[in-house]
């Protein structure tokens, strides 16, 4: 399997500060993107800590080759953010989304919390690998076959209100 990777982040036109962090490490076969929660203080710190801790937990290419190992890594990052977030921000803590990929031989493992999406570009075009953890997606998941809902029928905040984060 051939992987091509690239990382770039930009504040865009809407926000004043960029709370995104990312990691591209072809040597280790690890990739991450995190977006600090804008509703909590220290979003950029949370995303940076999550990505740096992920990098530290995967010390080399011989570590983390199963879904359960990657799940344990993400849970470890969550615990780390809870413990250290309280030191920085008190009871409110800090929060971030996190999507990580681990290239393990002929497969790619994914860990995902929040709405930082992962995509693959292949012969079928660009395909989304992750599922957003938002109120909007929760409602869409509850629809029965044949049912649909128009995007404009949902309150605006449903599109970006997270149901899961670190």
Describe these PLM feature segments.
Residues 1-166:
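PP2C/PPM-type serine/threonine phosphatase catalytic domain
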């Amino acid at each position: 399997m051939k992987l091509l990777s690239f990382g770039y982040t930009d504040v865009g036109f809407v926000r004043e500060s960029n709370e995104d962090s990312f990691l591209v490490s072809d040597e280790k076969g690890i990739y991450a993107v995190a977006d600090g929660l804008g509703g909590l203080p220290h979003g950029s710190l949370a995303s940076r800590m999550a990505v740096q801790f992920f990098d530290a937990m995967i010390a080399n290419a011989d570590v983390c080759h199963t879904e359960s190992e990657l799940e344990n890594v993400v849970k470890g990052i969550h615990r780390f953010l809870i413990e250290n977030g309280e030191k920085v921000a008190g009871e409110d803590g800090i929060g971030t989304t996190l999507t990580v990929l681990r290239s393990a031989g002929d497969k790619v493992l994914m860990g995902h919390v929040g709405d930082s999406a992962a995509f693959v570009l292949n012969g079928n075009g660009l395909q989304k690998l992750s599922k957003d953890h938002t109120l909007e997606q929760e409602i869409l998941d509850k629809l029965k076959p044949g049912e649909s809902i128009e995007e404009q029928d949902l309150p605006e905040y449903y599109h970006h209100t997270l149901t899961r984060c670190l």
